[in-house]
Design a protein with these regions (language model features):
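Active-site-adjacent structural elements in enzyme catalytic cores
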Residues: 1-344
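ATP-binding Walker
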Residues: 358
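ATP-dependent small-molecule kinase phosphotransfer cores
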Residues: 379-452
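Walker A/P-loop
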Residues: 361
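Hydrophobic anchor at the beta1->P-loop junction of P-loop NTPases
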Residues: 352
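NTP-dependent small-molecule kinase module
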Residues: 18, 443-452, 466-475, 479-492, ...
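P-loop (Walker A) phosphate-binding loop of NTP-binding proteins
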Residues: 355, 367
Length: 549
């Protein structure tokens, strides 16, 4: 079959719109853009055209289709007993990502509705598609324009991958702005019931209607033999080729969980701020943990991207269920066949960093007195040099065998001579360390019985470890104070102490990167200890209050 391509990204073209509409009138299949995902459209009143949708997608025929219309005035053409609530929702949210389940009229074939006496109605928020429907003069039945079992399409190129040569035309209307399918609400029951979370948050429906219940299929698999009342309820859509595990819980806790559970050949879907932690993996960022609109736009692209790789498994962070998070989580969990793992461990992680000589020890001791498990990343790195074969292999590949002694141990001095005279090699060492140490830190956090963890790392920010801390503290002190401390601590000259300070990031860097600052310029150890204890008490109190809010 020849597939026609209609480029309507930049302007409405009356001639091309008419040509696209003619495909629908003649009973053909046309991929259309919407604000949510691309749809595979056909005349919803033509049983043969609808059958071709199921054939092109490989879609089960008991999976209902949604009718797309240009405005609410078309509702009474295809629906019986339209309730006032439907017009109320249409006025407030149409055009937009909302589908309403209503009683169908006899003119709507049972093939379109999956054998149900109800039909889903939607007005898409895409001017080109509404113009095509208006010109065609028929309601357009349109599930997502992907092969069944594949992630939904959010660009016309995605549609081309799945449907070229199988359908009559593809309308390129640009990338979808929402990225997840429409929200579906059943208005034939009292109170109204959410059947599928989508681009319109549940909270918006509750605000408009009052009470809205949530069907159990939103959060768990339907039982065998149950008939789906709306698209996306029963069947495992959005499934990439590799098995998916979705990790629920707080963003930081779930990132720590991924670090300790994802295998070497795992693909990672994570929030933007955690990407540096997964060096060496194929990573698809979902969006920042606090930006659910971006997450919705990226979720299907993330799932689809991994099909072009050889990853053996996919691990995905899951947003909370507020706002669009309910829909994003629903799509991820469906991709995983509802295979989820919970990450919340009740642990609080305090990251401490700062310049040499700033006095981090005072804060670390204060944390210890609160029962914290202290993880010294530098110490962990040196322990890994002795025992971690993956790290040793990476070092050998980067720096050769000359950094190893005859007994096979790493000669740290020899390694230092190489990297401290060559900025590129130092950067290479930093990258290797950052690819290995965070995973070991996360493993030790998970193994510890302590609920409070102190993470001591000079490279806390660069390695991405700061992102998995509940709070990050920059410890600073005036340069003259640091010089005196380093000289006394290490027995070195003032010149050497100043050279060490000059080789590190300035205090301003740590101050800008961390959530708070502890200025340790006190003259005695006792005064520093008392101030550190007060500071840690304040930090723990603030974290507790944030958790309770």
């Amino acid at each position: 079959m020849e597939t026609k391509w209609f480029d309507l990204r930049t302007a409405e073209d009356a001639e091309r719109i008419a040509q696209a509409a003619d495909i629908l009138r003649r009973g053909g299949l046309l991929a259309i853009p919407t604000e949510t995902v691309y749809g595979l459209g056909a005349n919803g009143l033509d049983e043969n055209a609808v059958l071709h949708i199921f054939e092109a997608k490989g879609r089960p025929q008991d999976n209902p289709l949604i009718l797309h219309i240009p405005d609410a005035s078309w509702l009474t053409r295809y629906c019986e007993d339209v309730p006032e609530a439907a017009y109320k929702l249409a006025e407030r949210f149409w055009p937009g990502p909302l589908t309403m389940i209503l009683k169908k009229k006899p003119c709507v074939p049972l093939r379109t509705t999956g054998g149900l006496e109800t039909v889903g109605m939607r007005c898409p928020d895409h001017a080109v598609t509404r113009a095509i429907i208006e010109k065609a003069g028929v309601p357009v039945a349109a599930p997502s324009a992907n092969t069944s079992g594949r992630p939904s399409c959010t660009t016309a190129e995605h549609v081309r991958e799945d449907m070229w040569g199988k359908i009559d035309g593809i309308v390129d209307g640009g990338p979808c702005q929402v990225g997840v399918e429409s929200t579906i609400i059943d208005l034939t029951v009292t109170p109204p019931q959410l059947l599928r979370p989508g681009g319109l948050p549940l909270e918006s429906l509750i605000d408009a209607l009052g009470e809205v219940t949530v069907d159990k299929a939103v959060t768990q698999k339907m039982n065998d033999g149950e008939k789906p009342r709306a698209p996306g309820m029963k069947y495992r859509h959005y499934a990439p080729k590799a098995p998916v595990t979705v990790v629920t819980g707080g963003a930081k806790a779930s990132a720590r969980y991924l670090l300790t559970h994802a295998g070497e050949n795992a693909g990672i879907i994570c929030f933007d701020e955690f990407v540096p932690l997964f060096e060496g993996h194929i990573v698809h960022p979902l969006g920042a943990s606090d930006d659910k609109r971006a997450q919705a736009q990226h979720v299907f692209d993330a799932l689809r991207t991994f099909d072009e790789t050889d990853v053996g498994e996919i691990w995905a962070q899951c947003p909370d269920s507020k706002g669009l998070g309910l829909a994003i989580g629903n799509r991820l969990k469906k991709a995983a066949g509802f295979h989820t793992e919970a990450s919340d461990d009740g642990k609080t992680v305090v990251g401490i960093t700062g310049c040499t000589g700033a006095g981090k020890t005072s804060l670390l001791h204060a944390l210890e007195r609160e029962g914290a498990c202290i993880l010294d990343c530098d110490k962990i790195y040196h322990e890994m040099l002795e025992s971690d074969e993956s790290l040793r292999k990476a070092l050998r590949a980067a720096f050769g065998g000359t950094i190893f002694r005859a007994d096979g141990t790493v000669d740290v001095h020899a390694l230092g001579l190489i990297v401290f005279q060559d900025a590129e090699k130092l950067a290479s060492l930093d990258a290797i360390v950052c690819a290995h140490v965070p995973r070991e830190c996360a493993r030790r956090m998970a193994e510890s019985n302590a609920k409070l963890i102190g993470l001591d790392a000079i490279k806390l920010i660069e390695c991405g470890l700061g992102a998995i801390c509940d709070v990050t503290i920059a410890v600073t002190a005036p340069e003259e104070v640091r010089v005196r401390r380093i000289m006394a601590r290490d027995g070195i000259t003032e010149e050497y102490a100043r050279a060490r300070i000059a080789a590190q990031q300035a205090a301003e860097y740590f101050r800008a990167q961390c959530g708070c600052e502890f200025v340790n310029d006190l003259p005695t150890a006792a005064e520093a200890a008392a101030a550190a204890e007060d500071f840690i008490h304040m930090i723990i109190k603030n974290l507790k209050e944030e958790t309770e809010r």
